């Protein structure tokens, strides 16, 4: 079945190559894609090849993506794609709550070394039924996972905003070229009531206090001046499409305005 599916995909790509001027973006987790690099090469700047690499940690990869190839196999595939002259991009997604700034930085630096046209980023957003499965897999491998972020929508919101802010910070410190990083915030994050509930939960957890009028005003101001503009920027359809390679280098960013800082 897998060989048949691959044959159908290859045939479709051959038709696109010969009978159209369409561009093609491929995203996969499978190193088997290397078998078609000869065809990808023929597309030139019309094709972008991408790998999904959320972490460099092999055991975390086994926990969250038990049926996917490990990160080292994916990195080798990217390396061979670049060596073959194929333009590449990376989905650093979904990143995991078990990794902090140091691990995220190492992943981003490793991926940036491939000179990808784009790096997409999105934090993991687990459905409730998957949490128990991941916890069980972690126990099987002798590890624990930070599943507390999935206990409520508010706890997940806090995790997601923290993760986005960390990735923005790292990209700035790496001097990543404008337009390379693409953040993919979930549309449900664009809710001021949800943001305020998250802030109230954080006040009780971190400060041991109620959500006072002063804290409520500070949170409302943060939403209006910082969080909402950031979300609106990344929810703009122009920003949800990556750059495209051209014969003289990377094309200009779709939107000439840089991403707002939070």
Residue ranges and their predicted role:
Residues 102-262:
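Auxiliary Fe-S-binding modules of radical SAM enzymes
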Residues 1-162:
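Conserved AdoMet/S-adenosylmethionine-binding subsite of the radical SAM
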């Amino acid at each position: 079945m897998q060989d048949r599916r691959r044959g159908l995909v290859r045939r479709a790509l051959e038709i696109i190559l010969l009978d159209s001027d369409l561009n093609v973006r491929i995203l996969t987790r499978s190193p088997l894609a290397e078998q078609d690099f000869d065809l990808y090469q023929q597309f030139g700047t019309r094709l972008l090849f991408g790998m999904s690499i959320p972490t460099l940690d092999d055991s975390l990869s086994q926990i969250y993506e038990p049926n996917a190839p490990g990160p080292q196999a994916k990195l080798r595939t990217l390396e061979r794609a670049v060596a073959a002259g194929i333009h590449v991009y990376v989905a650093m997604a979904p990143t995991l709550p078990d990794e902090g700034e140091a691990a995220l930085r190492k992943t981003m630096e490793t991926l940036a070394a491939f000179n990808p046209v784009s790096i997409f980023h999105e934090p993991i957003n687990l459905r409730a039924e998957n949490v128990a499965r991941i916890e069980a897999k972690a126990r099987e491998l002798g590890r624990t996972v930070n599943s507390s972020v999935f206990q409520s929508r508010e706890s997940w919101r806090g995790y997601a905003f923290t993760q986005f802010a960390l990735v923005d910070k790292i990209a700035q410190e790496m001097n990543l070229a404008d337009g390379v990083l693409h953040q993919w915030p979930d549309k449900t994050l664009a809710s001021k009531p949800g943001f305020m509930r998250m802030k109230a939960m954080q006040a009780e957890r971190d400060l041991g206090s109620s959500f006072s009028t002063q804290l409520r005003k500070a949170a409302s101001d943060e939403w209006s001046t910082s969080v909402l503009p950031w979300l609106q920027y990344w929810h703009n359809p122009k920003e949800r499409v990556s750059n495209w390679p051209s014969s003289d280098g990377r094309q200009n960013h779709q939107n000439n305005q840089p991403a707002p800082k939070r």
